[in-house]
């Protein structure tokens, strides 16, 4: 694969020893294959976003060394660019959920080698109002759990893995009414959680949605109704299988556009970041960004 000049963005909040180890694993590999590698370290929350917004035409690839939060910032900047560089994800976070969908090795050195020897594929990006996400958007239980944890728990578990851990112990959740317009068809629902997905993993757990794909131009919409959460727990622990067994408790549909309204504004979780709320309009931007993937994907 031919690359001229790349930008490598890495999370500066990972601790000095961790940063040195991570850079030591990937920089020699990238430097061997690239004419030039510019390394930028994030220090403040929005740095990754601003680094990507200011990319010039000479940069043809952006490598993101970090977790799902850093990737989320970069994708929000790159998705709005007229000329978009290719993106390579180097999994350096707690969950690294989207990298799992792409089949990227979770070992950093192996990931760098696989991407350099790999190929490009065009993936869908989802747009929510004026923001973008790669993996998922959710309201209800997932947003409430992510928003309530303290900094120590975040550091130990990561926001989304904390959700999956809490899901194993929480006995019930309050349901809420919502009105959905799915590709123009309006339905009213009562649910404990609504997930709108592009990826297939949450907190390293694969959700076995039968038709999920990151290049089909469709959202995967999961409505979770059962307040005792048994069905949701079972679904997230299944390696494979059919969602049909949860009829009545869970509903799964695909759509290119969904509008969500709730009686009162509900906080929304996008790729592990809780900073938006309902109402929301979500649509797919088909094959919007080129990503590097291993050759066998």
From Swiss-Prot:
EC number: 2.7.1.-
Domain named DAGKc: residues: 1-132
Amino-acid positions noted as binding Mg(2+) in the UniProt annotation, renumbered to this chain: 213, 216, 218
Keywords, ordered alphabetically: ATP-binding, Kinase, Lipid biosynthesis, Lipid metabolism, Magnesium, Metal-binding, Nucleotide-binding, Phospholipid biosynthesis, Phospholipid metabolism, Transferase
Cofactor needs: Mg(2+)
Residue positions of the active site: 273
One annotated GO biological process: phospholipid biosynthetic process
Superkingdom of origin: Bacteria
GO molecular function, one term: metal ion binding
InterPro entries: ATP-NAD_kinase_N, Diacylglycerol/lipid_kinase, Diacylglycerol_kinase_cat_dom, Lipid_Phosphate_FormReg, NAD/diacylglycerol_kinase_sf, YegS/DAGK_C
A Pfam cross-reference name: YegS_C
Task performed by this protein: May catalyze the ATP-dependent phosphorylation of lipids other than diacylglycerol (DAG). In fact, is not able to exhibit diacylglycerol kinase activity in vitro.
Protein name as it appears in the record: Putative lipid kinase BmrU
Organism: Bacillus subtilis (strain 168)
């Amino acid at each position: 694969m031919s690359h001229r000049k790349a930008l490598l963005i890495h999370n500066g909040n990972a601790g000095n020893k961790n940063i040195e180890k991570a850079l030591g694993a990937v920089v020699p590999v990238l430097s061997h294959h690239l004419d030039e590698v510019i390394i930028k370290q994030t220090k403040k929350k929005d740095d990754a976003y601003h680094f990507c917004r200011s990319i010039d035409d000479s940069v043809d690839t952006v490598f993101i060394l970090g977790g799902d939060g850093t990737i989320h910032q970069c994708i929000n900047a790159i998705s709005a660019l007229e000329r978009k560089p290719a993106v390579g994800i180097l999994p350096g976070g707690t969950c690294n959920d989207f990298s799992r969908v792409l089949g990227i090795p979770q070992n950093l050195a192996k990931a760098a080698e696989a991407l350099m020897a790999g190929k490009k594929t065009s993936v869908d990006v989802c747009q929510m109002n004026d923001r973008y996400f790669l993996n998922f958007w959710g309201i209800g239980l997932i947003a409430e759990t992510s928003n309530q944890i303290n900094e120590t728990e975040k550091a130990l578990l990561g926001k989304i893995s904390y959700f999956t851990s809490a899901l194993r112990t929480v006995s019930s959740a309050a349901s809420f009414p919502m009105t959905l317009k799915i590709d123009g068809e309006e339905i009213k629902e009562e649910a404990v959680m609504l997930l709108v997905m592009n990826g297939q993993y949450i907190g390293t757990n694969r959700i076995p949605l039968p038709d999920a794909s990151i290049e089909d131009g469709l959202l995967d919409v999961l409505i979770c109704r059962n307040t005792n959460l048994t069905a949701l727990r079972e679904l997230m622990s299944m390696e494979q299988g059919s969602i049909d067994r949860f009829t009545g408790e869970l509903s799964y549909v695909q759509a290119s556009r969904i509008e969500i309204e709730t009686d009162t504004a509900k906080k929304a979780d996008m790729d592990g970041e809780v900073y938006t709320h309902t109402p929301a309009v979500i649509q797919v931007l088909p094959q919007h960004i080129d990503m590097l993937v291993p050759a066998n994907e």
